[in-house]
């Protein structure tokens, strides 16, 4: 399984860097920061499906 380390999140602001990640909610997140913030908000229910766009 693919995974990312979200231990240093949430962060108050994310950069505009575009390195897309596909979440288990079938939504494409622009970068790791955006994805990890969403993971924290979901209380860990959101996981990474794959790197790249959904």
UniProtKB/Swiss-Prot annotation:
Glycans are attached at residue 43. SUPFAM superfamilies: Kazal-type serine protease inhibitors. One of its GO terms (cellular component) is extracellular space. Keywords: Disulfide bond, Glycoprotein, Protease inhibitor, Repeat, Secreted, Serine protease inhibitor. The record marks 16-17 as: Reactive bond 3. The keyword Zinc does not apply. GO terms for molecular function: serine-type endopeptidase inhibitor activity. Disulfide bonds join 6-36, 14-33, 22-54. The keyword Lipid metabolism does not apply. Gene3D superfamilies: 3.30.60.30. It is found in: Secreted. Residues 4-54 form the Kazal-like domain. It holds the Pfam family Kazal_1. Its main location: secreted. Avian ovomucoid consists of three homologous, tandem Kazal family inhibitory domains. This is Ovomucoid. It comes from Syrmaticus mikado (Mikado pheasant).
